[in-house]
Amino acid sequence: AVTPVYFRLAAVITGSELGNSVSNVVKVSQVKLGEVVSTIELPEEMYLVGSSIGTAWGTWQPMVSVNGLAGEFWSMVYFDAGAEFKFGKFEQDWNGYSKIHQFKDNAGAGLSDSGDNIKVSKGGWYIVYLVAEVNGEDYQYTLSFYKPDVYVLGSTVGDWNYNEAYKFSVPEDKNGSFVSPTLTATGEVRMCIKADTDWWRLEFTLKDGAT
């Protein structure tokens, strides 16, 4: 920040009161103040907990770190209609609706406040995307909901773009399976979700190359 500063100069003869004088007020129009240094850092982990996640209000589901973007996380979650949830940087770190600086409901989930829980009006599968930013000595969060779109890209389908022909089918309930499109060639199966960033930041593949 830049601000004006006013001051006077005073002078005396050393060891004497003689010659004591004070200048007129001097104005310095622009003085740059010292930068405020925050003592907190972006979180390296993030968790979700709620009424539809594992054991209700007992399972802290870890989110996936976005590749190369510190403080950004995502997770694929099924919410029952009217489900509620919170989030935290670690287990038992209960953060709710009031902690969110900005909501971006890109999937029509119907997000609202319910006793500081985040309520999801419309049931179904969603991609939950959370961005944490440092704001002074606290965190500022942006919460986005996206449609549960998962795509195959790369050599197994011969396409490196989001292509509707290579999108997984989405189950209607939490017990269903996401079914991949038919692969057209051999190679490493590369998959990603779709959000407002580069696809390779949201990429995942088969565990141990098999499951």
Locate the predicted segments by residue.
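Insoluble glucan recognition modules
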Residues: 1-211
